């Protein structure tokens, strides 16, 4: 199996996939996360990266988090990133990820995709949190 992990952040999903023998490619713009491909998701061309069995995208949740009560929300930037992720997800497999309690799923460009959303409990796969 092959996993393309967009906005991979901590890489917890990819670590689990690799531990089960999957080939993974992580993409993130933050060099501190040490992704396989250091790139901006908005500039990622899926046609240059082959086929993947599963594509996971987790744009930064701070733009949509309900837990972020003291910080300013930048829905415009968050929407840019989630639209880029959606473009790539649609190219491959039309699957996506968003924390179950976040605002991303109610943004206008995501409403049409809500019937395909499911909850993934990463804590069941070795991560210290649920998404």
Q: Predicted regions: what is each one?
A:
Residues 11:
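Glycine-rich SAM-binding Motif I of class I
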Residues 1-3:
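Extreme N-terminal starter segment of soluble prokaryotic enzymes
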Residues 6-7, 34, 38, 42-54, ...:
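Class I S-adenosyl-L-methionine
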Residues 17:
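Aromatic pocket-lining residues of Rossmann-like dinucleotide-binding sites
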Residues 20:
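Conserved dinucleotide-binding and phosphotransfer motif residues
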Residues 5, 23-28:
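Conserved SAM-binding motif I beta-strand of class I
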């Amino acid at each position: 199996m092959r996993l393309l992990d967009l906005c991979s952040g901590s890489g917890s999903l990819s670590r689990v996939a690799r531990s089960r023998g999957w080939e993974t490619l992580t993409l993130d713009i933050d060099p501190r996360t040490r992704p396989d491909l250091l790139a901006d998701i908005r500039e990622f061309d899926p046609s240059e990266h082959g086929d993947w069995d599963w594509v996971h995208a987790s744009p930064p949740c701070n733009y949509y988090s309900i837990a972020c009560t003291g910080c300013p929300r930048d829905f415009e930037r968050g929407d840019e990133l989630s639209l880029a992720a959606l473009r790539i997800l649609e190219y491959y497999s039309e699957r996506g990820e968003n924390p179950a309690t976040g605002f991303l799923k109610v943004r206008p460009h995501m409403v049409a995709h809500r019937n395909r959303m499911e909850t993934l409990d990463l804590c069941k796969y070795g991560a210290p949190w649920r998404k």
